[in-house]
A protein has these predicted regions:
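C-terminal catalytic/substrate-binding lobe primarily of soluble NAD(P)-dependent oxidoreductases
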Residues: 16-178
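Short alpha-helices
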Residues: 1-9, 14
Length: 178
C-alpha cells in the first residue's frame, strides 16, 4: 500500500488537476489499535530503522537532512482528526521528485503515538536498535534482528485490529496559471 499508492495519487493529480506540482506532502496515519504493548505494522527491522534514521526532505532542488523525529506538527486526517505527525525519510520521495521535476518541496509525514515513541526510545537506549553484530554467548547476533524475532509478527496483527488508517497526498501547484 505504501509505498505505491502515493505514486498513484500523485500521477492522478498531475494528469487531472495540475499543470505543475510545486508541493507534495505524503501523509500516513495509523489510528488503529492492535492491542499489543509494542508492535510494528510491517517488518520491525525496516520500520525501526526508518524511524530512527535521519529525516530527509526535498526543497528547492536540494535534499535536506534532519535529526530523527526532529520536525513534527499536528496534521488533520480525514475520518480520524488531528494527530502529531513526524517528518521521515521515505524512498518514494526520491522517485517522485525525479518523475515530477516541477516539485519544489516534497516531504513524508507519519504518525506515532507517545507510547510507541517511548518504547522506541527505550529500544534505542538499551542498544536493541543496533544493526552491527555483537557477541552473545560466543555467537554473533544483530540486536535489531533479535528484537524482530521476539516482537509480534506484523502479519498476525490484523485479526484483532480496530480503527482506521489514512494515507494520502497533500498537493499544491498550478492549473491554467492559477
Amino acid at each position: 500500500f505504501d509505498p505505491g499508492v502515493s505514486g498513484i495519487f500523485t500521477a492522478y493529480a498531475a494528469k487531472h488537476h495540475f499543470d505543475e506540482i510545486h508541493e507534495l506532502d505524503i501523509v500516513d496515519c495509523n489510528a488503529g489499535d492492535h492491542h499489543k504493548a509494542f508492535a510494528t505494522n510491517f517488518n520491525p527491522e525496516i520500520n525501526i530503522r526508518e524511524i530512527t534514521q535521519k529525516g530527509l526532505y526535498y526543497k528547492d532542488g536540494q535534499w535536506i537532512e534532519t535529526e530523527p523525529l526532529e520536525i513534527h506538527r499536528t496534521l488533520t486526517y480525514p475520518n480520524i482528526g488531528p494527530r502529531e505527525s513526524y517528518l521521515l525519510h521515505h524512498e518514494e520521495l526520491e522517485s517522485l521528485v525525479k518523475n515530477y521535476p516541477t516539485i519544489r518541496q516534497a516531504r513524508f509525514w507519519m504518525t506515532f503515538g507517545e507510547e510507541y515513541l517511548t518504547h522506541l526510545r527505550v529500544i534505542q537506549n538499551i542498544g536493541m536498535a543496533r544493526i552491527d553484530p555483537i557477541d552473545y554467548n560466543g555467537q554473533k547476533i544483530v540486536p535489531l534482528q533479535f528484537l524482530k524475532a521476539v516482537l509480534p509478527n506484523p502479519q498476525e496483527l490484523g485479526e484483532n485490529y480496530e480503527g482506521e488508517t489514512s494515507i494520502g497526498c497533500r498537493i499544491r501547484g498550478v492549473k491554467n496559471g492559477k
